């Protein structure tokens, strides 16, 4: 087994790291003559946003490489970059890891013009405020914004080595008695991130379903693949 499945157990033990995820054109030979195929899939790239902690995140590919896959790119637009709770659901060093994370208020990957005066008396930006900032007066506080957000949000990500895996993800970390909409980004049945004649890194499926804390999600990770899930309370 090799990277990136080993990194959460080695380098990331020392703190956050910049891994520049989000590569959707995984055949680098189509960009430069000397390029090679990456050991990854699109869903592996999405899973990195959750399994690797990096509070300053990026989308590392060219904009034109995202255009054919805007439905998958939606996860990059949605996912947070900093967390107030992290749960490691399953893991085997160097082989695979599945992580669930709950975002901090100020970490969701959205932009806001401004939110007025914060608790310390300074003007500031709270990035989760986009859709309701206009409704608050100049003396709005971070606490005001937090209580105005009606949804509980979680993200789950998984990555694997060269071995395909089918996993059953327990959602018992969700609030009991609350329904959530799960958006599941998963490797397709014929996906593969191994650079051989079966290479098919851009094959994925996106499904939505209603779940609770008693639910389990069955997902497949292709060789060198992964998955990502966004969960939003209804």
Region spans (language model):
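Short edge beta-strand/loop segments characteristic of extracellular beta-sandwich folds
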Residues: 157-159
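Short secondary-structure junctions and interdomain/linker hinges
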Residues: 54-59, 82-86, 228
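Structural beta-strand/beta-sheet cores of well-ordered domains, especially the beta-sheet scaffolds
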Residues: 15-17, 44-48, 54-56, 96-98, ...
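Glycan-recognition and catalytic regions of carbohydrate-active enzymes
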Residues: 64-155, 195-200
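C-terminal beta-sandwich/jelly-roll accessory domains of carbohydrate-active enzymes
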Residues: 111, 124-128, 132, 138-142, ...
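A general structural signal for short secondary-structure junctions and capping/turn motifs
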Residues: 9-10, 40-42, 50, 100-102, ...
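Accessory carbohydrate-recognition regions in carbohydrate-active enzymes
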Residues: 20, 27-28, 34-37, 64-95, ...
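Glycan-recognition surfaces
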Residues: 1-65, 109, 191
């Amino acid at each position: 087994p090799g990277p990136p499945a080993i990194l959460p157990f080695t380098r990331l033990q020392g703190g956050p790291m910049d891994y520049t995820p989000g590569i959707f054109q995984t055949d680098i030979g189509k960009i430069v003559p000397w390029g090679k195929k990456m050991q990854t899939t699109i869903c592996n790239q999405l899973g990195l946003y959750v399994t690797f902690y990096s509070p300053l995140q990026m989308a590392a590919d060219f904009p034109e490489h995202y255009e054919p896959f805007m439905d998958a790119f939606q996860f990059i637009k949605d996912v947070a970059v900093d967390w107030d709770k992290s749960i490691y659901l399953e893991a085997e060093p160097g082989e695979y890891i599945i992580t669930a994370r709950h975002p901090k208020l100020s970490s969701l990957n959205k932009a806001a013009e401004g939110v007025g005066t914060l608790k310390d008396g300074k003007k500031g930006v709270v990035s989760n405020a986009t859709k309701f900032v206009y409704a608050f007066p100049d003396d709005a506080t971070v606490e005001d914004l937090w209580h105005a957000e009606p949804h509980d949000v979680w993200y789950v990500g998984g990555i694997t080595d060269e071995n395909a895996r089918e996993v059953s993800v327990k959602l018992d970390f969700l609030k009991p008695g609350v329904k959530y909409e799960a958006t599941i980004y998963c490797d397709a049945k014929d996906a593969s991130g191994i650079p051989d004649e079966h290479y098919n890194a851009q094959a994925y499926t996106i499904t939505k379903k209603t779940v609770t804390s008693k639910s389990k999600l069955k997902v497949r990770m292709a060789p060198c693949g992964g998955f990502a899930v966004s969960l939003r309370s209804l």
